[in-house]
A protein has these predicted regions:
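Residue-level recognition of pore/gate-forming positions within transmembrane alpha-helices
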Residues: 12, 43, 136, 152, ...
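An internal, D/E-rich "acidic patch" concept
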Residues: 57-113
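Alpha-helical transmembrane segments of integral membrane proteins
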Residues: 2-4, 16, 88-127, 143, ...
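Short hydrophobic, aromatic-rich alpha-helical segments embedded in or entering the lipid bilayer
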Residues: 42-75, 172-173, 204, 253-264, ...
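Hydrophobic alpha-helical segments of polytopic membrane proteins
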Residues: 6-8, 13, 150
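A hydrophobic, multi-pass inner-membrane permease signature
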Residues: 138-146
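Hydrophobic alpha-helical transmembrane segments of membrane transport/permease proteins
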Residues: 15-65, 155-174
Length: 311
């Protein structure tokens, strides 16, 4: 099991390195930070001094190796906008992003899991059709469209909630609900599919034939087995919390990590962008590892297989 987890960590770190490397190259080839930050009217001497100060006058391969050498020493670079540590700049926004993503995760689970189970248990009834209709709508409608619709209804027409900002807890309601509903739709669809597959297995019919109450069959046999594939999509949603906040934070002017990423890309604040991408990659790595561990807890057979594979 340890060998298996180490291999997963190694592959994940390689993936994160490739993502950061691709971003490193693309950002440096897509525009000159000196022009964007100083403005096109700045004198040539200012441009040269800026590039020299930030090492942008060196070949890109030299910048690349210097960057990763600094990363391995714990130096993730400084923001080109204000000179502060990029890690500090991003760290200041993390609590604001967590303030909407964690409640949104609760909404996803609280709505998506029961809805998916209900749709499977009442397959081909009006309950199933209603849940799937809402799920498909939430799954296919982009989050920024849903956010704009909710803002139009609750902020503009009804005036119950603010449409943007972060001054009070009320400002967090619409972005939280937007992210929560989109994720709930995804979880409901996957949970329904997993439950239907399990309910069609022979051991479910055998348990029913033995005279067990249907609720006991569902609770003791169907739900634990359906949880395994459902954990995969939940792990993905947890891992993409920061990435998923980019659009929603921009729509509602919520000053979290997602909006910071949009501004940093537009301003070519290279170190800040790379720190955020590193954060996103590590979050996904941690979520995937947690899901792998939960697999072994939910289904010991998987743990045994991995132990055998690692031995």
């Amino acid at each position: 099991m340890v060998q298996y987890l180490l291999m997963k960590i190694f592959r994940a770190l390689v993936t994160v390195t490739l993502i950061v490397s691709a971003a490193f190259v693309v950002l440096r080839l897509s525009g000159d930070p000196a022009i964007i930050i100083l403005g096109p009217e700045a004198p040539p001497e200012a441009f040269e001094a800026f590039r020299r100060n930030w090492g942008l006058d060196e070949p890109i391969w030299v910048q690349y190796f210097k960057y990763f050498a600094a990363v391995f020493q714990g130096d993730l670079g400084n923001s080109m906008r204000d000179g502060r540590s990029a890690l500090v700049v991003v760290g200041e926004r993390i609590p604001l992003t967590l303030a909407i993503t964690l409640p949104a995760l609760f909404i996803k689970l609280a709505i998506g899991l029961p809805a998916g189970v209900m749709a499977a248990l009442y397959r081909n009834t009006w309950v199933d059709r209603l849940i799937m209709m809402l799920s498909v709508a939430g799954f296919t409608v982009p989050s920024f469209v849903l956010g704009l619709v909710l803002a139009m209804i609750f902020a503009v027409w009804l005036g119950w909630l603010p449409s943007g900002g972060s001054d009070t807890w009320a400002h967090a309601v619409l972005p939280t609900v937007t992210m929560g509903l989109v994720g709930a739709a995804v979880i409901a669809r996957f949970t329904r599919s997993a439950m239907l597959e399990v309910l069609g297995q022979p051991y479910i019919r055998t348990a029913s034939a033995k005279g067990l109450l249907w609720r006991d069959v569902v609770r003791n046999h169907a739900l634990p087995n359906a949880a395994i594939p459902t954990l995969t999509i939940i792990g993905f949603l947890v891992g993409s919390l920061v990435a998923g906040a980019v659009v929603v934070e921009s729509v509602f002017s919520w000053p979290g990590v997602g909006r910071l990423l949009v501004n940093a890309v537009a301003n070519r604040d290279l170190a800040v962008v790379q720190v955020i991408l590193l954060l996103v990659g590590l979050t996904m790595v941690g979520a995937n590892l947690a899901v792998d561990i939960l697999y072994g807890i939910v289904d010991p057979r998987l743990r045994i297989k991995r132990l055998q594979a690692g031995s």
